[in-house]
Amino acid sequence: MKKLTINNLSKYLNSIIEHNIQSSLMIWGAPGIGKSSVVEAVAKKQNIDLIDLRISQLAPTDLRGIPVPAENKASWYPPDFLPTAGKGILFLDEINMAPPAVQGIAQQLILDRKVGSYQVPDGWFIWSAGNRKEDFAAVFDMPAPLANRFIHLEVSTNLDEFKEYALKTEIDDKIISFLNFRPKLLHKIDKNSPSWPSPRSWDIGNKLLNANLDIDPAVGEACASEFRSFCKIYKTLPSIEPILKGKASPKFPSDLSAKYALTCALAVRAKTVKEVENALVYVDSKAGAEWLTQCTYDVSTIWRSNKKAEQLVDMIIANKKLIKVAENVQKLLAA
């Protein structure tokens, strides 16, 4: 099965549409990593419609329609949520959580592009998504004839891509710093708790954090407890603004979590080329190569997403103190 990150999945799906590949497609992956969001974003980018059906919540008659007598025969009136014209994506989400009877009706849509007298219009792509058994999801086995008709893609989490998303959407830099420090907590299913960390739940947790609420209901008690301990360390960091202005050069923290917190905070809060320069020179002089690389990576991610890459490269090449990271920055920005 082809394995992709979220960003690569987006590129793959866009290419499928641009080349008009009408084969049905199945996206596998753990819950909470953004499968549905990617499909929604692709539809928006391609300027086509999206019909998102949670198959696990439908009954067989919901897809097949209602029988209506006509001249001693029964005609089936299809549901109004199925497409009749135009171009778009018919997205059958949670397909393997649906009971076999519903999967059987969905199979007709996928294999034959029709159910009864209803025909899926030519301009529509039929895509599906589902969780895997190893994710502790209540899923049914997919029949072999159905599985064999799909293009199968498996998507996984990627911290660098989540950080890029987090920076674009202004997720609190304490969350980004914490996940730099504890990357395994980006996504960790807890089968004994309804709440656990995932890209989706961190997004929700950020909203709770902004409202001065505990994030336990979003990411779970154990993860939230670690995050609170990290935030206490965050409060002990030296003031960020004087460093960015080049007016202070305090001692670099000795605590590992504080090192992650400070380097990320500098990267996130540096808004101008000069502030980035001051931040990198400070980290280089006080912390050394490892932390300069970490800070440079975060800065590069931010400036690439903000489409200011050239300014960053020019500044680093011009600064003799930072020439050692110039090649790495150019590679990161070109990725």
Which residues make up each language-model segment?
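AAA+ P-loop NTPase catalytic core and its hallmark functional loops
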Residues: M1-R182
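Glutamate identity and glutamate-enriched acidic tracts
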Residues: E18, E40, E71, E94, ...
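Short, surface-exposed, charge-dense and proline/glycine-enriched linear segments
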Residues: I55-A59, L82-L90, P145-L153, W202-E221, ...
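Long, positively charged, glycine-interspersed low-complexity recognition regions
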Residues: D284-A335
